[in-house]
Amino acid sequence: MEECQRNIDNTVSTGKEDQEKIDYWKACIIQCQGLITYAHRMAEEAECQAASCTDEKRKKELLAIAENCRVVPEKPPQTFWQAHQMVWFAHVYFQIEVCTTACGFGRFDQYMWPYYKKDVIDEKNITQDEALEMLECFYLKACEVYEVRDKWYATSFAGYPMWEILVVGGQTPDGKDATNELSYLCLEAANQLKTTQPVMAVRTWEGTPEELIRKGCKMIQEGQANPGFFNDYAAMKMTLGKGCTIEEARDWTIVGCIQPGPGGGSTDGSPDAGYVNMGKMIEFVLHNGVDPRTGKLMGLQTGDPREFKNIEEFKDALKKQILHHYKLVTTGYNIMQGIHMLRYPVIFASMVTKGCVESGKSVQQGGAKYSTAGLFITGAANMADSIAAIEKCVYEDKDITMDELIDALDHNFEGQERMRQLLLNKPEKFGNDEAHVDGIYREMMHFIVDEVQQWSDARGGHYSFNVHSQTVNVSHGAVCGATPDGRLSGEPFCDNAIILNHLFLNGRDVFLRIPAICICADSSQSELRLPLLQVVSSNKYFSVGVQSPTEINAPRGRTLSGRQWFCADRNGV
């Protein structure tokens, strides 16, 4: 509040821009006053309950809660408990303001460490068990955050995830290992409760203690699919690409669901600008922009595919189709951002984002130090496999004509199972260390990235491209007909950046490079099987630059060929 008031006092309004800044700072002050009032009301309620409470232990707790709520957020927290209360208030304020998903807790073990160290280690005001109980109470509160979603949203983001990510481990801004006693305690709290929120994320690099990785792996072995492991080196590279310093890159955290972003509250996040369905793009190319489900012209007219002379002409048409639809997505997104900028600025989120108070602009106005928006894709592997199938079966070996292929797809391979098996089995498949089809995938991804990263949104921020589907691959697959990779009409597309389950042919080490990991473990063993720990902590994991968060499923009671195979990709569960 003091900073905003100083800015108001030091600014002379000489025009519209100055007045907008003054209005923004005044709004921040009003917001702060409202947040303090909210906390004081909580204190009054706790005192009211304490007055009628006959349980002395509970009464003491209620009075402590009241005291905490009269300290934070008006003043800085002094204890580990007050720090928890401060973080929770901030989380609730975000939810009140924007009712948002993907509002994570950041590098919890870093900003909470001074309070833990003071209370538990230095002054011994509380025991480690009491600190653990506070963490567990905090985690239970996180489970109370919930969104009621419509049918499409519930299908596309199945399981009603809120993506309240809590990050531990990694590096300090000066490049030292950041793991501390609280890092382990955060995992232990999650291990004991086994709740869906918060989602635990372990940052790993060559300096990460094996004990921390082992603890996370042990949790996975017990069947939690939690925590996820994130590779520092790949994430730092992505973060540096957004223009931040090396210190900010080392301090990276998860912005949104899985996207790495600069730490320290310097980014406005990576909101979901929209998804493009690669299966549908192929359908549009094969039907010259017409949606075969509706008969309407929905895409770009790229010509009759029967006239294409080679695979390069097909890929050129597909690239034009993809860019056309990403431009439609970003046009709609910019319109929405412009409306939000004028009608619905998020004041609290702006207050706690570096650059906004200093510049006098909300995050929608481009006030954040770093600004990005996420563009997403579904069916990436299906696209690569479809291109490879057309190249091999239509243009090279001439097993079928383009007209025959289109007719078979339009009829969902009815009476054409032989053709479908040909498309499924003859061409190379992405993600199996086959250079040609992997090259197709890489070519298409690089093309999209090189294009969209040149674009700016309404806030002046840049777009980041993510192969990241959640379960949108299910809803997108449901509205797409059969595809040239042999997929049937209505079937889900591949999950995120990984390949289709039945096309995983060439082993764990190949799968590491996709990026995602496939590991073999036996969840019935009392001791952790080494392959699980070795893959997560191995040099190979770091050397291939696996950015995709590594989540591991250890199913119980179901054995496949004497082993339990499970794919490791956070949103593929």
Each language-model region and where it sits:
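A conserved hydrophobic secondary-structure block that centers on an alpha-helix together
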Residues: 50-60
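Conserved catalytic cores of very large enzyme subunits
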Residues: 1-27, 61-573
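Extended non-globular scaffold/tether segments
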Residues: 26-40
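A basic, often C-terminal nucleic-acid-binding module that engages the phosphate backbone, implemented
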Residues: 47
